[in-house]
Regions:
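All-alpha prenyltransferase/terpene-synthase fold signal
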Residues: 1-193
């Protein structure tokens, strides 16, 4: 995760005002003691499988996003924070109950996707909408590792473009196929890896 991106997300949400601004954790991400409320496995989950960069950092590193890397990192962090409010341990927003976590998560999805629409990047809007949907399917099936793989593959598709392997992996996830996790992990790898 990029601490700078999370700090930008924190500031953006405060500036938006409204209910979401009241839920922003007051502690700086750079100085937060992550162990205070979050189990170690939840911290690892929020960073992506095997300690990889966050999906936002990965998406922002690609050739399709490099001209606006900070904006892409911020909007993907917003969407990923929404996902973590639903299924993990958020890093920026603290909601006191499950209903508020769900609403705040949905709001962050909307904020991130709206910023992406403003950039005119409709393929990435579709990709991240698929990522949200497919990771929710994986979570509902108790497949957290599959959800992680979906996020990493979705981030790679935003930064580098989709591929037939990635589209095939998404179809496998939708079908509930047992080989979906390996296909998704493979589609998340750099070309030629």
């Amino acid at each position: 995760m990029s601490v700078a991106a999370l700090e930008r997300l924190r500031e953006m949400l405060r500036q938006q005002g409204g209910l979401i601004a009241t839920l922003v954790d007051r502690a700086s991400v750079a100085h937060a003691d992550l162990d205070r409320e979050v189990a170690p496995e939840a911290v690892a989950h929020s960073l992506g499988e095997n300690g990889l960069d966050s999906p936002a950092s990965l998406a922002a590193e690609g050739p399709l996003t490099e001209a606006r890397s900070e904006e892409y990192e911020l909007l993907v962090e917003a969407i990923y924070e929404g996902y973590l409010l639903h299924y993990g341990s958020p890093r920026v927003v603290r909601a006191p109950d499950a209903d508020l976590r769900l609403l705040a998560g949905d709001r962050l999805y909307a904020i991130g996707l709206a910023r992406l629409v403003e950039l005119g990047d409709t393929p990435s809007v579709a990709e991240l909408a698929d990522t949200i949907t497919l990771s929710a399917l994986a979570q509902s099936a108790g497949e957290r590792q599959l959800a992680d793989a979906i996020w990493l593959a979705g981030a790679r598709a935003v930064g580098w473009g989709s591929s037939e392997a990635h589209r095939h992996a998404k179809r496998l996830v939708s079908a509930g196929a047992p080989e979906a996790i390996e296909a998704m992990r493979t589609s998340a790898l750099p070309a030629g890896a």
